[in-house]
Amino acid sequence: LFWIGAIVVSTMKQAKRKRSVQKDEGFWAVFTHFKTASRTMLKDRRLFWLTIANAFIFSAPMAVLEFQQVIFENIGIVAAVFGFIYAAKRGISMLFSTFIHRITRSLSATGALFIMLCLAALYFFGFGFLQNQMLIIIVSLLPSIVVVIQDVVISDFRNKLIPTGSRATTISFGNFIGGILKAVILGAITLLTLFVSIEIAHVIIGAALVISCLYLIPMT
């Protein structure tokens, strides 16, 4: 069988042209997809503002997570505890994922965003003002709940508003907006630390987030 297979393979001709989806579509196809997604969002006012508000609330705490360990060390939490904290975050995410939809079933998208904003604000102001180690650890778990609400509840609302044919492209465009916001917020907090402490920088970012979202959320 081996030799028969070898003979068959040896008689096969190499393909004359290798096709590449990336090459066929070209780099500019990315912008075409984003153009389609932006049109989809602009046609539905609720979808547009839901995507923007969600990007702000979700991206802000995700952008500053890298600074958690600095604040932990500033208040005396030793590095050996970090692993337990991050394990607790994963546990919180798993736990809330199982029943978060039951809790938020009666909520509108606006209500879910408001809960996310409250949790994000508690995180920023907690890391800005708290000095108690246990309270800081508890507050550090809040972004995990924000992630669950975003992944389960907000995604459900968005999927109901997006036409089936452009769902993947529109969601990708929303993620792209979130990525830009993360970069901007990360750059902003880095610049702030040149003038104020990392704790005060958290308070400033948190205040800016609350002010922005108190305008954005009612639009949803």
Question: What name fits each language-model region?
Answer:
Residues 70-76:
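Membrane-interface helix caps of multi-pass secondary transporters
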Residues 1-13, 49-70, 82-105, 116, ...:
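Substrate-agnostic recognition of the 12-TM MFS/MFS-like secondary transporter fold
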Residues 2-6, 94, 118-122, 206-213:
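Small-residue-rich packing faces within the transmembrane alpha-helices of Major Facilitator Superfamily
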Residues 111-126:
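Structural signature of the two symmetry-related core transmembrane helices
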Residues 126-140:
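Helix-loop junctions at membrane interfaces in 12-TM secondary transporters
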Residues 1, 188-210:
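A membrane-interface helix-boundary motif in multi-pass transporters
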Residues 14-52:
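Juxtamembrane intracellular "pre-TM" segments in multi-pass secondary transporters
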Residues 5-25, 217-220:
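Helix-loop junctions on the cytosolic side of multi-pass membrane transporters
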